[in-house]
């Protein structure tokens, strides 16, 4: 784990500095040791951030990404594993044992905050999740370029023809066994931190690619950053509600599948976290 490695290196560096300077022979080590530890740790964090900046600068967003980049994915995963404990985020994961042990799938989840993809990447490290996201995400600092290298699929929901191209691209990614696809079918972060109606078009991906649908729900991600700024711990809950086998999708329409997924999510979240139908 990257955080553990950084801590170990910082301890060794601090001890080495104290031993090399001879301060262990005086009471000076009482301040030299913690200062050396903190300084080394901060330098490691800054160095890792600079590495990510350099990697981001090297990405050409105009060049199509033909395959998943293990290097960029590994760096992103390590960044997530580093940030979660630093921000004192407790992630409670349940139901993950239901996830397909092999093969590709379409993962769908409700959307509360920009950090949601990080929570899903952390929970499914071996699934090579490629996210469908709105075009604006491509311009987000660091995030857009790293998602691009991990086969991210930007979608233009305002243009049906462009949206169809993204759906067809996702189907190819699944057919060619390049990655599993993850999407937030509400179509973005909506108001009230509750579940909104789903956009059914994305379910054509599972129907055409003949892959199972992994249905998840998230709670609490919208509170993480505000609590972190107050130096308070936070809790995020990720629940894998269920898996719809590919065989059960045969003969169904995207609307039918979307309604089934919506009911699964709504039942799991409970009425207090679901927008009433009368308010749609």
Segments predicted by a language model, with ranges:
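A generic local structural motif
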Residues: 78-79, 90-95, 117-118, 167-169, ...
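Non-catalytic C-terminal accessory region of glycerolipid acyltransferases
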Residues: 6, 164-280
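A short acidic, often aromatic-flanked loop/helix-cap motif at beta-alpha or helix-coil junctions
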Residues: 99-101, 139, 160-163, 244-250
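Thr-Gly-centered strand-to-loop micro-motif
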Residues: 94, 132-134, 156-157, 185, ...
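Catalytic core of membrane glycerolipid acyltransferases/transacylases, capturing the structured
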Residues: 55-77, 85, 101-160
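Membrane-anchoring hydrophobic helices of lipid-metabolizing enzymes
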Residues: 1-104
């Amino acid at each position: 784990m990257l955080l553990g490695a950084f801590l170990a290196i910082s301890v060794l560096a601090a001890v080495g500095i104290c031993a090399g300077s001879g301060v262990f022979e005086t009471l000076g080590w009482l301040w030299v040791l913690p200062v050396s530890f903190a300084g080394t740790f901060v330098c490691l964090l800054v160095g890792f951030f600079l590495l990510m900046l350099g990697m981001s600068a090297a990405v050409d967003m105009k060049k199509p990404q033909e395959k998943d980049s293990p290097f960029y994915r590994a760096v992103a995963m390590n960044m997530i594993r580093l940030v979660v404990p630093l921000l004192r985020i407790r992630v409670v994961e349940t139901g993950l044992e239901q996830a397909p042990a092999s093969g590709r799938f379409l993962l769908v989840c409700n959307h509360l905050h920009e950090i949601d993809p990080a929570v899903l990447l952390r929970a499914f490290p071996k699934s090579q999740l490629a996210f469908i996201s709105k075009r604006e995400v491509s311009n987000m600092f660091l995030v857009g370029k790293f998602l691009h290298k991990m086969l991210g699929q930007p979608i233009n929901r305002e243009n049906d023809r462009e949206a169809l191209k993204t759906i067809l691209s996702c189907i190819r990614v699944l057919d060619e066994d390049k990655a599993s696809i993850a999407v937030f079918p509400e179509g973005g972060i909506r108001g009230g931190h509750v579940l909104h109606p789903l956009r059914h078009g994305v379910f054509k991906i599972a129907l055409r690619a003949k892959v199972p649908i992994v249905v998840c729900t998230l709670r609490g991600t919208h509170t993480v950053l505000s609590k972190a700024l107050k130096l308070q711990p936070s809790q995020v809950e990720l629940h894998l509600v269920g898996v719809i086998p590919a065989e059960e999708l045969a003969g169904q329409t995207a609307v039918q599948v979307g309604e089934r997924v919506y009911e699964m999510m709504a039942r799991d979240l409970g009425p207090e976290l679901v927008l009433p139908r009368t308010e749609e």
